[in-house]
Amino acid sequence: MAKLTKRMRVIREKVDATKQYDINEAIALLKELATAKFTESVDVAVNLGIDARKSDQNVRGATVLPHGTGRSVRVAVFTQGANAEAAKAAGAELVGMEDLAEQIKKGEMNFDVVIASPDAMRVVGQLGQVLGPRGLMPNPKVGTVTPNVAEAVKNAKAGQVRYRNDKNGIIHTTIGKVDFDADKLKENLEALLVALKKAKPTQAKGVYIKKVSISTTMGAGVAVDQAGLNASAN
């Protein structure tokens, strides 16, 4: 059996795996235990009451968190004409069509988000094998294929998170950095849960949001009592 590091021993001693913590207590615990030498992200796992094997129960979308994620995001946009100028004005780092596709084919991938106007999808479609496995393929369901590319760029820069359930029906995403004020982390979590509620598949039965856990990049998960959140999610 692998030997536990001192840090993991402390986490195990402090975190009661059987308990659901009040959100304020949970955040305080994460802050106390975040001792990595970098500013850790605060991640969330939301267990949904869906059957992930059924395509009509899968949950996918995007929402802008009120306080952002604390990450600086580089955006690439496939578009042309007036839309290209609008994308640049909104802050996109890379804007183009075939020229941008050629850069990507050469392995130049210096961006975090890819956005495309509908007329550019004929170009983006050639890049599925490159962008798809990295989770970067533009998709209308998460607002990254849109005629209004400038708004999509602004959303990406403002701290938009994209979410999609995994095969176990769990959503994994980030809600900020551990050095955020506790209130900002709480409000970001509440905003995410509200977005997930709006995205609830009509076919999903029973309790929809079954469990919410938050963790830091290097830390253990802390289960959160939903009763203390202003996003009563069932």
UniProtKB/Swiss-Prot annotation:
GO process annotations (BP): regulation of translation; translation
Cited InterPro entries: Ribosom_uL1_bac-type (IPR005878), Ribosomal_uL1 (IPR002143), Ribosomal_uL1-like (IPR023674), Ribosomal_uL1/biogenesis (IPR028364), Ribosomal_uL1_3-a/b-sand (IPR016095), Ribosomal_uL1_CS (IPR023673)
Keyword flag rRNA-binding: yes
GO CC, one annotated term: cytosolic large ribosomal subunit
Pfam family, one: Ribosomal_L1
Entry keywords, A to Z: Repressor, Ribonucleoprotein, Ribosomal protein, RNA-binding, rRNA-binding, Translation regulation, tRNA-binding
GO MF annotations in UniProt: rRNA binding; structural constituent of ribosome; tRNA binding
Record's function text: Binds directly to 23S rRNA. The L1 stalk is quite mobile in the ribosome, and is involved in E site tRNA release.
Subunit structure, interactors included: Part of the 50S ribosomal subunit.
HAMAP family hit by this protein: Ribosomal_uL1_B
Family: Belongs to the universal ribosomal protein uL1 family.
NCBIfam families in UniProt: rplA_bact
Descriptive protein name: Large ribosomal subunit protein uL1
Organism per entry: Klebsiella pneumoniae subsp. pneumoniae (strain ATCC 700721 / MGH 78578)
Highest classification ranks of the organism: Bacteria, Pseudomonadati, Pseudomonadota, Gammaproteobacteria, Enterobacterales
